[in-house]
Amino acid sequence: DGSITMQNPYWANYRNLRENRKDRYMLNAALSYDILDWLNVSGRIRIDNSHNTYTEKMYASSNVQLTEQSANGLYGVTKTMDRQVYGDALLNINKTFGDDWSLQANIGASFSDMKNDALKIRGPIADGTSGEKQGLANVFNIQNLSNSTKTVRKQEGWREQTQSIFASAEVGYKGTYYLTLTGRNDWPSQLAGPHSNAKSFFYPSVGLSVVLSQLIPNMPENLSYIKLRGSFASVGVAFERYIANPLYSWNESGLSWNTQ
């Protein structure tokens, strides 16, 4: 088939270069303080940052199907930054009332912030065929790229943040009967736009449980614990970004902004 071309494997290995480098660092910290023997506060924070650089270098004399038809080669570089930050603070309660009643509860708040930024340029090295000044073969620099529509220049990114408050409580009676209640309210950034009917959502749960092994006398030795539990819960999740707050999009082929 005359439409199929092949390259020397040695050339493909040493003159068609693709390199990916990623630098990443993470930080975790937590603090806890006992106010009373049944009451304490705690806080946590987690940071995860990464920087990624992806480069392409196609040398002159490479298959022009790989260089956007340029005889002088192709160059591309994409830089991406990702950042994730999470933090929370909690007030924790663990208390008994007499011999029969117990309470385990917590009240807290949290936030989650995620951000992505990307900058990309990729295109053929100018070879003079489009009426522009010829570039320097095998000089991998963005100023050396063609100004034609074959060169892609793109900057994009997104950011999402969710702020939350939550609480849970479990009341126990005689170590046998338990009532569990939880509730959480989220304010996600995806709902912050003008097309959203609500800025937050609440999702609760309720549960009842009985430790049957506390009620059954003469339990078999090989069966030491039986618990019956029933619960109801609702779950909330935000929809995709930009639905409530649409943005303009870039038309690469027409080199113009698409209006919403």
Regions flagged by a language model, labelled:
Residues 2-58, 69-260:
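Extracellular/periplasmic, surface-exposed regions of secreted and cell-surface proteins
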Residues 60-62:
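Short amphipathic helix-turn modules centered on a small-residue break
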